[in-house]
């Protein structure tokens, strides 16, 4: 609860210090060492708003513009859709587990929004998708200009196995709008989603993020809030070794963020979500 109250106050302060400025792009080919350390192939985009020039830092600019399935990073906008459509009332509503064993203990239990986000509980979001419907989902996607805005699918969930796709650059654009409460949804819903995204918090910083994985590639997207400005990030990597590669997402991002002092060198003093 203390973290949540601090997060709200800190966000208000951070937003108050935000000022628009011209932004350039700087290729960071030297970041290859972080990917090489973990034998990973991928891209990362970092938008550092602490700096006066507000540079967009990119490793592998070509890949950063290539669209991939958002996988569970889509839970960020999907939660907004569900709240707006009335598929869920608030973070306290309980979704009863149907008793089907889904191979992961975190999924085999009753859920609320917080646990569904933390555990990436797909079945809860499948309920939302059914309630929202394809036509309304398409309208929402176009309304927020999310990737290719295509929720079509021949089999499975459209955000994992369907046509929906988004690039790392586009993830950054979406996250920035959410951070500033500029998406076409109620401000209280945007604030709730940001609260659900909290991973860690220190004395003067907050890390909000979401993982994603569709089998062949994985994401970690989010931002770190500081009093001097926020640092947004979107990474995707190939995962040829499947689950054995998943730890690399956060490991690479954390190493890069620490290298630019966007995360402290030591582990966070508080953790609100196991990833």
From Swiss-Prot:
Any GO BP: antibiotic catabolic process
Pfam families named in the record: Transpeptidase
Xref: InterPro entries: Beta-lactam/transpept-like (IPR012338), Beta-lactam_class-D_AS (IPR002137), PCN-bd_Tpept (IPR001460)
Modified residues (N6-carboxylysine): 75
E.C. number(s) listed in UniProt: 3.5.2.6
UniProt xrefs under Gene3D superfamilies: DD-peptidase/beta-lactamase superfamily (3.40.710.10)
Keyword annotations of the record: Antibiotic resistance, Hydrolase, Plasmid, Signal
SUPFAM superfamilies in the record: beta-lactamase/transpeptidase-like (SSF56601)
UniProt signal peptide: 1-21
Catalytic reactions of this protein: a beta-lactam + H2O = a substituted beta-amino acid
Covalent S-S links between cysteines: none
Catalytic residues, chain numbering: 72 (acyl-ester intermediate)
Residues that bind substrate: 210-212
Listed GO MF terms: beta-lactamase activity; penicillin binding
Function: This is an oxacillin-hydrolyzing beta-lactamase.
Family: Belongs to the class-D beta-lactamase family.
Protein name: Beta-lactamase OXA-2
Source organism: Salmonella typhimurium
The organism's taxonomic lineage, starting at the top: Bacteria, Pseudomonadati, Pseudomonadota, Gammaproteobacteria, Enterobacterales
Gene name tied to this protein: bla
